[in-house]
Amino acid sequence: MRLGVNIDHIATVREARKTYEPDPVKGAIIARDAGADQITFHLREDRRHIQDSDVEKLRAVITEIPLNMEMAATEEMKQIAIRIKPDRVTIVPEKREEITTEGGLDVVSMTDYLREFIKELKDNGINVATFVDPVEEQIKASMEVGADAVEIHTGEYANARSDKERDNEIFRIKKAAVYGRSLGLKVFAGHGLTYTNVQPVAEIEEIEELNIGHSIIANAIFLGLDEAVRKMKKLINEVRRKDIRV
């Protein structure tokens, strides 16, 4: 199983003072060298953390492992992606007032628009995933609009308050992952995953990649980023020994 390390919150700390450090690009290099299988970042429309200059630098230095750009389905972001050429674009919903992404993309309501949007990205050599809730209707629509993969939103699982709720959410995620694979899609997962809740998701064999950011960066304050990445990789590998490549 691959681990994508999201570096957004390194930039969040930097932007708290509108200064030059910590540098998310340096963080990406450390994460890569610690065993990250992918670097993920979200260039938001409001530029609250990652900046355009970061994106340019990330593309220049992250060449040995995939670079995954999370973005809203806007014309501005599409043109940036076509110019930068990340290895993958993950299309996410975005609201300016939200603290973090609050749910999955409603692909069903945007099929005509997304079909053309995704085609242009793929015509420029970029793989495309949609970030969706564990709902078969959204996964099927993702396949129909031409996505190569779905990333299943694990936020409801992460926010579950009881063992029963967590078990129910794991069942939903597992069912969605099986369905996605049956349609020929690659299946990833992420959002709200931590050192204490990651393993039940990592055990789902249909999921081949997890994207994790906040928990790793939060622990890096105390452990250092290198050790924080290695610790997460170790937890995943304890339940998933199979190494799946793009």
From Swiss-Prot:
One of its GO terms (molecular function) is pyridoxine 5'-phosphate synthase activity. Pfam families: PdxJ. The active site is at H42, E70, H191. One of its GO terms (cellular component) is cytosol. The record marks E151 as: Transition state stabilizer. Transmembrane segments: none annotated. Keywords: Cytoplasm, Pyridoxine biosynthesis, Transferase. It catalyses: 3-amino-2-oxopropyl phosphate + 1-deoxy-D-xylulose 5-phosphate = pyridoxine 5'-phosphate + phosphate + 2 H2O + H(+). Its EC number is 2.6.99.2. Pathway: Cofactor biosynthesis; pyridoxine 5'-phosphate biosynthesis; pyridoxine 5'-phosphate from D-erythrose 4-phosphate: step 5/5. 3-amino-2-oxopropyl phosphate binds at N6, R17, G192, G213, H214. It is an enzyme of class 2 (transferase). GO terms for biological process: pyridoxine biosynthetic process. SUPFAM superfamilies: Pyridoxine 5'-phosphate synthase. 1-deoxy-D-xylulose 5-phosphate binds at D8, H9, R44, H49, T100. It is found in: Cytoplasm. Its main location: cytoplasm. Gene3D superfamilies: Aldolase class I. HAMAP family: PdxJ. Homooctamer; tetramer of dimers. Catalyzes the complicated ring closure reaction between the two acyclic compounds 1-deoxy-D-xylulose-5-phosphate (DXP) and 3-amino-2-oxopropyl phosphate (1-amino-acetone-3-phosphate or AAP) to form pyridoxine 5'-phosphate (PNP) and inorganic phosphate. Belongs to the PNP synthase family. This is Pyridoxine 5'-phosphate synthase.
